[in-house]
Every structure is written in C-alpha cells, then in structure tokens.
Amino acid sequence: MAPDVENTRIVSRSGIGSGTGARFVLQFSTGESFTVVGSGLIGRNPRPEPGEFVDHLVTITEPARSVSKTHLEFGQEDGVLWVSDRHSGNGSIIREPGTEPRPCIPGLRYRLTRGTRVDMGEQFVVVS
C-alpha cells in the first residue's frame, strides 16, 4: 500500500450519507412504512445523480404516476429531518400541524417536525 494512502486519517461525515443520526418513520398513504436514518431519495423509482450517495432509496408503489421517479430528497441536520423537492412534476406541499400548508420550492430544504405531512402528487407521507 502506498505510504500516503496508508497514513490517511479517516474523518466523520457528520450524518451526511453515513447512516447515522436520529431514526424517523416515514408512513405513506399507500400503506407502506419505512424507518430511515441519514439521507435518501423517495419516489416511484428513485435514483441518485452520478456521484451522489445516499443511505436509502425509498420506492413507493404508485400506479397512478402522480409521484415522480425521484420526487423528494431527505436528510438530517442536528437530529432534525429535512426534505427537498427534486423538481418533481406535481410538486410537494408541507402540512405541519398548526400551520398553513407550504408549497415546496424545488431545491430548497425544509426542516420537518414529527407529525408533519408532506404531499407528493396524489400521495403523502407522514413523518414520525
């Protein structure tokens, strides 16, 4: 092994793509439920971009195709789950308890509290 590789110091990735952090349960209107830690993509057939790495690819069954192939991205920051719309065809709406619904601007991250519902086309997911 080359000396420069042998002496490489491994550093923590602070929950970015490392599968570490708080656990969240994503409960979908389709009846599907997934426990996630770290980062991921949600959709009918989610795929990362070249060079992008995520902990989870969450595929939901959605024959009506109102949910995009890669509809939402999620991750964690300081133990809080965030989502970002991936320029989906039908958009996403955040419905946090006690607040007005907020349409997601594609590419922006929205921090979610447990109990928040995110609409994706004709389907939705509740974070717990």
Segments predicted by a language model, with ranges:
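Short hydrophobic/aromatic patches on the structural cores and recognition surfaces of FHA
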Residues: I42, H71-F74, V80-S84, N90-I93, ...
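Short cationic/low-complexity microdomains
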Residues: S33-T35, H87-P103
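Hydrophobic multi-pass inner-membrane translocation pores used for secretion
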Residues: N45-P46, P50-H56, P63, V67, ...
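Intrinsically disordered, low-complexity acidic Ser/Thr-rich regulatory segments
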Residues: M1-R65, R117, Q123-V127
